Amino acid sequence: MSVELWQQCVELLRDELPAQQFNTWIRPLQVEAEGDELRVYAPNRFVLDWVNEKYLGRLLELLGENGSGIAPALSLLIGSRRSSAPRAAPNAPVSAAMAASLAQTHAQPAAAPVMAVADPVSVPTAEPAQASDMAEASSRDSYDSMADSAPAPVAPGRTEQRNVQVEGALKHTSYLNRTFTFETFVEGKSNQLARAAAWQVADNPKHGYNPLFLYGGVGLGKTHLMHAVGNHLLKKNPNAKVVYLHSERFVADMVKALQLNAINEFKRFYRSVDALLIDDIQFFARKERSQEEFFHTFNALLEGGQQVILTSDRYPKEIEGLEERLKSRFGWGLTVAVEPPELETRVAILMKKADQAKVELPHDAAFFIAQRIRSNVRELEGALKRVIAHSHFMGRDITIELIRESLKDLLALQDKLVSVDNIQRTVAEYYKIKISDLLSKRRSRSVARPRQVAMALSKELTNHSLPEIGDMFGGRDHTTVLHACRKINELKESDADIREDYKNLLRTLTT
């Protein structure tokens, strides 16, 4: 049987499978012909067992249909066709007689997404997965559901994988997005400290902050900075073993390792990296077995001087369901918040993205978008893409009028959600006072400070003038509103409580 027939059948299977599944489980396979027998090599037992269970039946069917019609002789082994002594799997050789039963499981293959690479990978599940609500489980069915609910968040063609040979057949694949670098990161007041800390780690790993813990809301640049560190480490040392993954993938890998009685291989993989970058660590909450394993992995890495970088959507002490010993260890290094970008940074982000897309974006147009899209960078970029597409399809230059047309539904929703009435109601609920208190003449600190916060938010989030805002706060003068805004801006610099309150309210009102 020829290798060409195998390649032909693999191409047919590519058309039947989602790209993520094909790239994860089929692409890593290597094949060589030995007489009438095909020897198929999987990089490790993870891949071998999964291919055997989920895809082998269909592969044998395709080989039979496109070959001579005779059941092919096929052996599954662990190793590489270039290795001198591959290790035979206990279930090899496999004949077509097994195809019927194996093909039954083909209808529901597991999706462990990964971008395509030319060379095989050894641990295919160590990649970023979308933050889905996957429960820790020990049964095969629970792992299937876990894998099926993890689509890749990285756009096709955006991920560069780098394979580094380590002990035995084990390889490390970084799964870093090559476009996320320090050069493409837009620095502003809201992320200045986080960017500086990330650069310090990238330029001086193991001797800087370890672990580095970045936290903040969705779409603020935490993942970008994490990838930037990884890319810089690999730029300095292409042989560095840098691995990025989502926390749910760590859970999925651990469950799979337990099922395959391969926990030692799992430990060896994660404890042999030079830098481990784990996104959205809050998904370890209430997963006791995963926390236990990560606790020991974390300790082993720090004791070995290897770099650890973590991200979360909240301050580590606020992650409910996370063991105190983990929270304590996360504080051993440096914990930095990534705040929502201020207006100037949002404008700079839009201008940089437009420049990268080779699109002319007038400054007043960027300012218009930035004023109205405030929640996070991801939504900001999404709005810009819509504007660019509208401009391209309509054959018109980007103007404020065109922006109003292309973002009509989004702007209407923003205007509906962010009104002075809504701000007053949200602030009153947050500080546990009555709306009537905000409109009253009371000057006690418990009322005056929330009133000033509400006025400052109204100025930032709405298009009302100062006199209009003052009128909606019990008929106050515009100078009162101006004083409130200046006072809150000063307190955000000096008072951590006010800064946190304002950030929380801003997130609530704009998300």
From Swiss-Prot:
Annotated keywords: ATP-binding, Cytoplasm, DNA replication, DNA-binding, Lipid-binding, Nucleotide-binding
Origin superkingdom: Bacteria
Region Domain III, AAA+ region: start-end pairs: 175-391
Primary location recorded for the protein, binned into one broad class: cytoplasm
Region (Domain II), start-end ranges: 91-174
Span list, region Domain IV, binds dsDNA: 392-511
Protein's UniProt keywords contain Protein transport: no
Listed InterPro entries: AAA+_ATPase, Chromosome_initiator_DnaA, Chromosome_initiator_DnaA-like, Chromosome_initiator_DnaA_CS, DnaA_C, DnaA_dom, DnaA_N_dom, DnaA_N_sf
GO terms classed as biological process: DNA replication initiation; regulation of DNA replication
A GO term, aspect molecular function: lipid binding
Pfam families with a match to the protein in the record: Bac_DnaA (PF00308), Bac_DnaA_C (PF08299), DnaA_N (PF11638)
Gene Ontology terms: cellular component: cytoplasm; plasma membrane
Region (Domain I, interacts with DnaA modulators) residue spans: 1-90
Localisation: Cytoplasm
Entry keyword 4Fe-4S: no
Residues reported to bind ATP: 219, 221-223
PROSITE patterns associated with the record: DNAA
Annotated stretches, region: Disordered: 125-161
Subunit structure: Oligomerizes as a right-handed, spiral filament on DNA at oriC.
Domain notes: Domain I is involved in oligomerization and binding regulators, domain II is flexibile and of varying length in different bacteria, domain III forms the AAA+ region, while domain IV binds dsDNA.
Family as reported in the entry's similarity comment: Belongs to the DnaA family.
Function summary: Plays an essential role in the initiation and regulation of chromosomal replication. ATP-DnaA binds to the origin of replication (oriC) to initiate formation of the DNA replication initiation complex once per cell cycle. Binds the DnaA box (a 9 base pair repeat at the origin) and separates the double-stranded (ds)DNA. Forms a right-handed helical filament on oriC DNA; dsDNA binds to the exterior of the filament while single-stranded (ss)DNA is stabiized in the filament's interior.
Protein name: Chromosomal replication initiator protein DnaA
Gene giving rise to this polypeptide: dnaA
